[in-house]
Curated annotation (Swiss-Prot):
It comes from the Eukaryota. It holds the Pfam family Pkinase. Regulates COPI-mediated retrograde protein traffic at the interface between the Golgi apparatus and the endoplasmic reticulum. Involved in the maintenance of the Golgi apparatus morphology. This is N-terminal kinase-like protein. Its main location: cytoplasm. Residues 755-764 have a biased composition (Acidic residues). Residues 14-314 form the Protein kinase domain. Keywords: Activator, Coiled coil, Cytoplasm, Cytoskeleton, DNA-binding, ER-Golgi transport, Golgi apparatus, Intellectual disability, Neurodegeneration, Nucleus, Phosphoprotein, Repeat, Spinocerebellar ataxia, Transcription, Transcription regulation, Transport. Residues 587-600, 660-680 have a biased composition (Polar residues). One of its GO terms (molecular function) is DNA binding. GO terms for biological process: inflammatory response; neuron development; protein localization; retrograde vesicle-mediated transport, Golgi to endoplasmic reticulum; spinal cord motor neuron differentiation. The protein kinase domain is predicted to be catalytically inactive.
Length: 808
């Protein structure tokens, strides 16, 4: 019934790739590349075609087929499947390359290192030790043709054709009959008298010496060449000489050879071998050992082969995160290995892990993800960012740890181009409004302003019109000087997003107010920005036809190209604020401040741009900010430098009062009335339903420190404020000011989202005078209360000695 017969080769689940065999191995087998039919995964297929009159070779091939199926060891070629018919033998193994071809390719690429060879020889010797000491088997074919390399660079021992038992129960060693293989036989095999005393491993260790010589010097021409070590490293030469010694009795056991080479200073005593040995036993290591290993791994990855990192280190890192408790220490080596992957491999292997990491509550992991986002952001698609990453990232805006808040703000620069309309224009702006108004850390408020300036072009036209002017105006009233600089530079960076009316009526009045700022850096930037905006206005005034060209971006949709230009306007104006992050790790103060150049955003053609000037150290160096924000009368203990919850980061209200006192030299009463006015308008707008989240103007709690400077002494009795004088005419005149109706502007209520017009330009002169007078009376009342309390304490406590208070 021959028509019921089936071709076993056709039903075999693996197929050969139609290519010539690899290598031309001496012996009965031909090595082909293949793949699994179901999945397409690559494999190697050793093929032996049965030929008439070659019974001896057929028996050798069948014996090897049997050995492949029964021997299992990490350093021996892994058997996957096999096929035995009357016409052929197929042995399917993991995908490998002959060692000779691999070494030649590595040398041509200029990437072969002694580290790779040391670990490869370690694996071959370990396989021989397993065969001789554990299985009592003699390999009898150790040579270059019997060693293969997998895709991770691991060396595997194959060539099991001529293996026999060391106990003699299976007969003597089979005859090879192949001159290419017989040249590796030790000299004692030529002595037929049998009087030579040798160990069971002696012949294989001689062949190991031949393999070492060929790895470093190329194909062995004759046995006499073994006397010259050639390019064999000096640390390996003494052990090599033991292997090729004429006396087989002194050749070391494979286990002892490994021990000798692993001694301090030995050829196999290096970081690469130690890393591989740890990875082989990582499942039984203690958690503390794993933590230490992954922490030190990043330093060594640069010296390791790329294939090893991709195919051996990466799976262990992914496993450690998925099933272990390695935590944040996995991130740094994970992203370092990720650089070796293609975009497709990165999407398949690393992105799922990254997405899962963002949902972690571990602060260390969250902050490291934010710090290293630049390495993987290009592999994230928009749906993944908006649905799986952004909802977890925004929790960082509410974190009590300043370092996490700071890194969350910075990460928005990378995420903004991938955010959808709702997340970018609604959710993100809500958090930015709260941070800029209420965050107690001046550097974080400053970086929020900087980030807004960089992502401004990604916002929708309506959001830009509603947000940018109000946000940057608020920043110019921040008591933290770098925040005021950031507000000015924010206007300059986004100058193309404002209409000429907004430039003249909203932006220039704000900038002009900063020309009398106590900080010279603020004044300098204000003057430059004013000149830039005036230049635009003047050019449009001279040639009104330029108006359309100048305002082309005002109502334009969000543009990534515009965002790229804005992103370079000043770098991170508070780049040094990363000290908040480093402060989480280090307890030592930062170094002295340095000056940083802040380049301006390029202006439209025909409009002169302000010349880039170095910004003083104050807005660019974290160490100075920390000193500026600390209470100068309080000395902190250095041991508490990294305790965020307990650390005194300074009182912005106290700092604001001292700044206000300095401002009195620039304008009498004007700053006080301005701050009072803003505070009052903020109080009104805070009653809107969305004031807790979506209001830049409603959340000005930090500005109240400008309103009540307790250190300022009240003016003498009878003193009149400058605003109380009638500068327009005689005091006895009862006529109203004929220009009053022109100068007075109706006060407008803030819109429900409170992103609208700033209230600083809408209050009348009379209300400013009344509020200034109320502020003065409030300070006087506060001073009296403090004096009364001091008097009460003196009466209650009694007399006090010099330097000590009397105990109750």
């Amino acid at each position: 019934m021959w028509f019921f017969a089936r071709d076993p080769v056709r039903d075999f689940p693996f197929e050969l790739i139609p290519e010539p065999p690899e290598g031309g191995l001496p012996g009965p087998w031909a090595l082909h590349r293949g793949r699994k039919k179901a999945t397409g995964s690559p494999v190697s297929i050793f093929v032996y075609d049965v030929k008439p009159g070659a019974e001896e070779q057929t028996q050798v091939a069948k014996a090897a087929f049997k050995r492949f199926k029964t021997l299992r060891h990490p350093n021996i070629l892994a058997y996957i499947d096999g096929l035995e018919t009357e016409k052929c033998l197929h042995v399917v193994t993991e995908a490998v390359t002959p060692l000779g071809i691999y070494l030649k390719a590595r040398v041509e690429a200029g990437g072969l290192k002694e580290l790779e060879i040391s670990w490869g020889l370690h694996q071959i010797v370990k396989a021989l030790s397993f065969l001789v000491n554990d299985c009592s088997l003699i390999h009898n074919n150790v040579c270059m043709a019997a060693v293969f390399v997998d895709r991770a660079g691991e060396w595997k021992l194959g060539g099991l054709d001529y293996m026999y038992s060391a106990q003699g129960n299976g007969g003597g060693p089979p005859r090879k009959g192949i001159p290419e293989l017989e040249q590796y036989d030790p000299p004692e095999l030529a002595d037929s008298s049998g009087r030579v005393v040798r160990e069971k491993w002696s012949a294989d260790m001689w062949r190991l010496g031949c393999l070492i010589w060929e790895v470093f010097n190329g194909p062995l021409p004759r046995a006499a060449a073994l006397r010259n070590p050639g390019k064999i490293p000096k640390t390996l030469v003494p052990h090599y000489c033991e292997l090729v010694g004429a006396n087989p009795k002194v050749r070391p056991n494979p286990a002892r050879f490994l021990q000798n080479c692993r001694a301090p200073g030995g050829f196999m005593s290096n970081r690469f071998v130690e890393t591989n040995l740890f990875l082989e036993e990582i499942q039984i290591k203690e958690p503390a050992e794993k933590q230490k290993f992954f922490q030190e791994l990043s330093k060594s990855l640069d010296a390791f082969p790329e294939d090893f990192c991709r195919h051996k280190v990466l799976p262990q890192l992914l496993t450690a995160f998925e099933f272990g408790n390695a935590g944040a220490v996995v991130l740094t080596p994970l992203f370092k290995v990720g650089k070796f992957l293609s975009a497709e491999e990165y999407q398949q292997k690393i992105i799922p892990v990254v997405v899962k990491m963002f949902s972690s509550t571990d602060r260390a992991m969250r902050i490291r993800l934010l710090q290293q986002m630049e390495q993987f952001i290009q592999y994230l698609d928009e749906p993944t960012v908006n649905t799986q990453i952004f909802p977890h990232v925004v929790h960082g805006f509410l974190d009590t740890n300043p370092a996490i808040r700071e890194q969350t703000v910075k990460s928005m620069l990378l995420l903004a181009p991938k955010l959808n309309e709702a997340n970018l224009n609604v959710e993100l702006m809500k958090h930015f409004a709260r941070l800029q108004a209420k965050d107690e850390q001046g550097p974080i408020r400053c970086n929020t302003t900087v980030c807004l300036g960089k992502i401004g072009s990604y916002l929708s036209a309506s959001t830009r019109h509603r947000v940018l002017t109000s946000a940057f105006s608020r920043a110019t009233r921040d008591p933290f000087a770098p925040s005021r600089v950031a507000g000015v530079l924010g206007f300059a960076a986004t100058h193309n997003l404002y209409s000429m009316n907004d430039c003249a009526q909203k932006i220039l009045p704000v900038l002009c107010g900063l020309t009398v700022d106590p900080e010279k850096s603020v004044r300098d930037q204000a003057f430059k920005a004013i000149r830039s905006f005036l230049s635009k206005l003047e050019s449009v005034s001279e040639d009104p036809t330029q108006l359309e060209e100048v305002e082309k971006d005002v109502h334009a949709a969000s543009s990534p190209g515009m965002g790229g230009a804005a992103a370079s306007w000043a770098g991170w104006a508070v780049t040094g604020v990363s000290s908040l992050t480093s402060k989480l790790i280090r307890s030592h103060p930062t170094t002295a401040p340095t000056e940083t150049n802040i380049p301006q955003r390029p202006t439209p053609e025909g409009v002169p741009a302000p010349a880039p000037t170095p910004v003083p150290a104050t807005p660019t160096t974290s160490g100075h900010w920390e000193t500026q924000e600390e209470d100068k009368d309080t000395a902190e203990d250095s041991s508490t430098a990294d305790r965020w919850d307990d650390e005194d980061w300074g009182s912005l209200e106290q700092e604001a009062e001292s700044v206000l006192a300095q401002q009195d030299d620039w304008s009498t009463g004007g700053q006080v009335s301005r701050a009072s006015q803003v505070s009052n308008s903020d109080h009104k707008s805070s009653k809107s339903p969305e004031s807790d989240w979506s209001s830049w103007e409603a959340e000005g709690s930090w500005e109240q420190g400008w309103q009540e400077p307790s250190s300022q002494e009240p003016p003498p009795d009878g003193t009149r404020l400058a605003s109380e004088y009638n500068w327009g005419g005689p005091e006895s005149s009862d006529k109203g000011d004929p220009f009053a109706t022109l100068s007075a502007r109706p006060s407008t209520q803030p819109r429900p989202d409170s992103w609208g017009e700033d209230n600083w330009e809408g209050l009348e002169t009379d209300s400013r005078q009344v509020k200034a007078e109320l502020a003065r009376k409030k300070r006087e009342e506060r001073r009296r209360e403090m004096e009364a309390k001091r008097a009460e304490r003196k009466v209650a406590k009694g007399p006090m000695k010099l330097g000590a208070r009397k105990l109750d």
